[in-house]
Amino acid sequence: MHSLPVMVLFGLSFPPIFFVLLVSLTLFFICIRLLHSSGIYEWVWHPALFNTSLFCCLFYLLFHLGV
């Protein structure tokens, strides 16, 4: 992951971690929609902490898998 170059789009430079962030945000919103529709989200004691930990876990996994 550290060998990826900086991406330049329309004159703006983005670090490689920015694209991992976008992918993890997309997966996060998909997971939240699935959890809401399946009813599992009703069993969550503290939704804000659950959302934060879910996003952190997704971001960590994607960063270390090298997506």
Swiss-Prot record:
Cite the InterPro entries for this sequence: DUF1656 (IPR012451)
Transmembrane as UniProt keyword: yes
The topology of this chain with respect to the membrane is:
Multi-pass membrane protein
This protein's name: Protein AaeX
The family assignment reads: Belongs to the AaeX family.
Q: Where in the cell is it found?
A: Cell membrane
Per its UniProt entry, which superkingdom is the organism in? Bacteria
In which organism is this protein found?
Musicola paradisiaca (strain Ech703) (Dickeya paradisiaca)
Instruction: Indicate where this protein is primarily found.
Output: membrane
Which GO CC terms are listed, alphabetically?
A: plasma membrane
Transmembrane ranges, per UniProt, are: 10-30, 43-63
Q: Which UniProt keywords apply?
A: Cell membrane, Membrane, Transmembrane, Transmembrane helix
